[in-house]
Amino acid sequence: MPDHPLGLTPLARRCIAAGAILMLCGVLLGAFGAHALQAQLTPRQLASYQTGVQYQMLHAFGLMIVGIVGQVTGASPRLRWSARLMIAGIVFFSGSIYLMTAGAPRGLGMVAPLGGVSFMAAWALLAWHVLSPTLSGIAGEGARKGG
């Protein structure tokens, strides 16, 4: 039984908390971009920055989904790696965009595809976990009942 007052497993607690913190940071970065950076950046730079914020928000929410799935089905190496890769994707993809917008060398843009691949792998691992017929808990019961 989980040792958390809300009954959350360690994976669920970490993923939901990290996702919420990354969402908070995404809101702050989005507001900063809309108010402080709008006059400083070209329209293309601002669009790129906003893409970084959007991807951060989407994948922070994805990280929270990983935590919820882990709470329902139990943790697995696939879920743990999905969470790690969501975070890595945010750091590499969104982080490189933020840094380039702040004036970092354009060569840093070569890091962004690593973030994109991390995002894709994270979603694939989450799908694999959910579709796995060997899951315990609710998903396993549904598979045994033909659902």
Can you say where each PLM-predicted feature lies in the sequence?
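Juxtamembrane helix-break-helix junctions at the cytosolic face
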Residues: 67-79, 101-105
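Hydrophobic alpha-helical segments of small multi-pass membrane proteins
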Residues: 20, 83-97, 112-127
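Interfacial segments of alpha-helical transmembrane regions
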Residues: 7-23, 78-86
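Membrane-interfacial alpha-helical segments at the cytosolic side of multi-pass membrane proteins
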Residues: 60-73, 121-133
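Core segments of alpha-helical transmembrane spans in multipass integral membrane proteins
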Residues: 21, 25-31, 47-72, 86-94
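Glycine-biased, low-complexity coil/linker segments
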Residues: 140-141
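Helix-boundary and loop/linker segments of multi-pass membrane transporters
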Residues: 5-12, 39-42, 74-76
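Interfacial helix-loop-helix junctions of multi-pass membrane proteins
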Residues: 34-49, 95-117
